Amino acid sequence: MFWRGENFSLEKLPADRSRVIYAPEPHKPIDDIDAAIRHSLLNPIEMDPLPALLFPGMKLTIAFDDISLPLPKMTRPDIRQRIIEAVLDMAAEAGVDDVHIIAALALHRRMTEDELRHQLGDRVYDAFAPRGLLYQHDAEDPDALALLGTTDHGEEVEINKRAAESDLLVYVNINLVAMDGGWKSTATGLASYRSLRHHHNTHTMQNSRSFMDAHKSELHKSNWRMGEIMRKHGPKIFQIETNINNDTFPDPFAFLSKREWEWNGRDRAKFVATQAALKRTPNRIARNIFHGIEAPHNMTSIQCGEVEAVHKVTTENVWKQQLVEVQGQTDILTMGIPFICPYNVNSIMNPILVMCTGLGYFFNLYRGKPLVREGGVVIMTHPTPNEFHPVHHPSYIDFFEQVLTETTVPHD
């Protein structure tokens, strides 16, 4: 089965020359998530328990990953809500009343009220948003940024001013892939454009050999250099990282998570009926259907404390859930591109994002070598309509129509 945007298809491949790679089975989630959260906050890695870091009169800032994770969105309550509520309860017990909550957007689009409520829950939103204490990071507002220093590579480290001036910065992360978390949480999510330009560029992409292996990724090397500046000159950071399983689709889409030979009669009927219905459905409605999916994936581990020590555990857990061993590269790699990527949640998968998802994310989902050999062929399936969201992706339109018509050379 191949994804084709807001639809899918069954294709025949040469039986004697094809290898089909399937994701591992979802790991079992934690039974008592709230108890696991509390235990982790009280037993962090290489740091004091969270209550010992809280005191009256302090500035406490809680930052969290935006809607680019997880994909699709999680069934409520989102684990960010559960973690932030636990942190707030401990802060209240310690007499902390100067608390800000910040969505770590980097340069992503701003979230809507409904999206924030889905992530944080009504209790947190109603308590903080009306008073201006829940807001979204602005990477281009000079009055809301603070320069912490410069790395030995000449990279300015400039982050959210409130976070920089806090006595404690608590970061709440979700990890689906090894690319996320660690210093990338704060050094990217709360960074200014002046900082982001050092690692979100074509040089970084062309000189990285996998974004899923930090040792081969220029993106991670830059973020870790910035992390050293933050460690020396920034706020104390209490990193909270979580792993979730890959239980992605609920009924009536559960057949999408199965291998084709595992389909029973009901699954095959659902596939045929869904595919036929989607062919008759306008793109806008089909898009709304898929983006309305709430995934049953849930938390399999939580670890808190010092950034690098925490991330080491998180990464090991990611690999346990996600790694598939493949022997040898292939001549031709086929990839079905689905309806969603980190940059089009509740939005349109425009032609640029199709390329970004396939050649950026999917191609780089490896640790050792790429699945396809150098000089090989990549075939992606997606209808790729000339369609853009004018509010979410306005700059993409000019880039697509004015720049890519003149050159496709990255350094140009």
Label each residue range with its predicted role.
Residues 1-38:
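N-terminal amphipathic/basic leader segments beginning at the initiator methionine
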Residues 71-95, 191, 358-371:
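Histidine-anchored nucleotide/phosphate-binding helix
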Residues 347, 353-412:
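C-terminal catalytic subdomain
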